Swiss-Prot record:
Source organism of this protein record: Desulfotalea psychrophila (strain LSv54 / DSM 12343)
Name of protein: tRNA pseudouridine synthase A 2
Chain positions recorded as substrate binding sites: 117
Protein task: Formation of pseudouridine at positions 38, 39 and 40 in the anticodon stem and loop of transfer RNAs.
Any one GO MF annotation of this record: tRNA pseudouridine(38-40) synthase activity
Lineage: Bacteria, Pseudomonadati, Thermodesulfobacteriota, Desulfobulbia, Desulfobulbales
Length: 261
């Protein structure tokens, strides 16, 4: 068998998450990113044994610029030809960015040291049609200096090792995670939206819906519906009810996964 480590970017708008399911080959209206890559890989290998295993199981509608996956195929092929072959068969909203040889022992889904996500949102009375499927619309006039200071104060509460039971889907197993970095930035790189901001969060791992619940709490905070003490309480004690709705998937982007090569 031959093994490769690939870096993948995708726009998750039209996909039902990363993880392949049997429906990928049965119902094209419900594709997943992994399943779409696997179908392309089968064509390259003439339907010989092949597998794709990702490092992060992103939800439906979530995007990625730095997903990592391991590809296993029986056919001998160079990394360069595999990259070109996959990109020629994949839809334009999925791209293989890098492809390097790997080993049988390497497991993409294990051993990551950290993961970095960004959550993009636009604060304006009217949504921006150019970014409506990659950023959340927050229907307020603007985010001023005081709002930004408040959001950053809230972000600091999440840094460190905490029990994120209240900020995740119930039944996720152990709910302790360590956050290395959490802050709000203005997305100055975007000429399409001067009012775009993003949450940058880096941690040793994230529970299901964890970042979306954190972002949901930040949105409620800037709207004045909760206060900082509410966030502190929900980090300290298990609660019956959620502090906020979870933010929509479309603003979430997987940026980077650090781990063994």
């Amino acid at each position: 068998m031959n093994y490769f480590r690939v870096k993948i970017a995708y726009k998750g708008t039209h996909y039902f998450g990363w993880q392949a399911q049997s429906i990928d080959t049965l119902h094209e209206e419900k594709p997943t990113v992994e399943g779409t890559i696997l179908n392309a890989l089968k064509k390259i290998t003439n339907y010989q044994p092949c597998t794709v295993s990702g490092a992060s199981r992103t939800d439906g509608g979530v995007h990625a610029r730095g997903q990592i996956a391991k590809i296993t195929i029986s056919q001998k092929i160079s990394p360069e030809h595999l990259l070109l072959g996959l990109n020629s068969l994949l839809p334009t909203d999925i791209r293989i960015l890098e492809c390097v040889p790997s080993t049988k022992e390497y497991q993409a889904s294990r051993g990551s040291v950290s993961k970095e996500y960004h959550y993009y949102f636009i604060a304006s009375p009217v949504d921006n049609v150019a970014t409506s499927d990659i950023a959340l619309h927050l229907p307020i006039d603007s985010i001023g200096p005081d709002d930004l200071a408040l959001l950053r104060s809230a972000c600091r509460l999440f840094v460190g090792r905490h029990d994120f039971y209240n900020f995740s889907s119930r039944g996720s197993g152990t709910s302790f995670r360590e956050i290395f970095y959490c802050d709000i930035h203005r997305a100055n790189f975007s000429p399409l939206a001067n009012d775009m901001f993003y949450l940058k969060i880096i941690g040793d791992g994230f529970l299901k819906y964890m970042i979306r619940y954190i972002m949901g709490a930040l949105l409620e905070l800037v709207r004045g519906r909760i206060v900082l003490d509410d966030i502190s309480l929900y980090l300290q004690q298990h609660q019956e009810d959620k502090l906020s709705p979870r933010a929509k998937a479309k603003g979430l982007h997987l940026i980077r996964i650090e781990g063994p090569k």
